[in-house]
Amino acid sequence: NQPVTGIHWWGMFGGWTESHLPPDLPVAFHIGIWTDGTRDSDVFDHPGSLIWETYSTNWVWAASGNEESDSKSEPGETCFLFSQLLSQDQWFQIDQARDGSGSTVYWLSIAALYDSERDEPEHVWTWKLRATASGAAGTSAQTILPAANGLSWPPTLGAQWKTGREIYDSWFNPLDMAFQL
C-alpha cells in the first residue's frame, strides 16, 4: 500500500468565468480523510470519523475548462484544477489508518476556508461534481459531531459525520466530487 503523497481536486468559484483566479480566494483548504461509517449505520454510504487532516495554504492551480452554462448566451463558470503535494511528514499512511474493521474504504473531504474578518466572498468555491466510477454517490456533510473539546468547523481529528445527504444529478444519477490522490 502506497501512501497518499499529494491531492488534486477540481472546483469552480460561483459566477466566475475568467481564466484566472477571482480576487476573493479562500485563505486555505481543509483536507480530511475519514473512515467509512456505513457499516455502523442503516443509511446510505457515508463517512465515519476524521482520522487525518491538513490545511492547504500553498496549493497550485490551473484553469481546466468551463462548465456548461444554463444560458447559451453566457459563458459557463471556469473550472480550476488545484494541486497540493504533501511533505513526507504529512503523508496519509493507509496501513496506519486501519481501525480494525477490515474496511478499505476511506472518504475525502475538502472545504474552502475564508477569512472570517472579511465580507462573505462574492465568488464562493464549490466542488466540481462528476459521475461516479463506483456507482456510489458522494455525500455532503450537514452535521458533524465535534471531537472532545474540538471545533465543529472545520472539523478536527476524531470528529464524526452525523448527518448529510447523497449527491445526485437531476436524473438521479449518483455524483461524486472530482479528485485524484
Annotate each predicted stretch with a short phrase:
Residues Q2-P3, P26, S103, P174:
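Generic structural microfeature
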Residues T17-I144:
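Aromatic- and Gly/Pro-enriched, solvent-exposed loop/edge beta-strand patches characteristic
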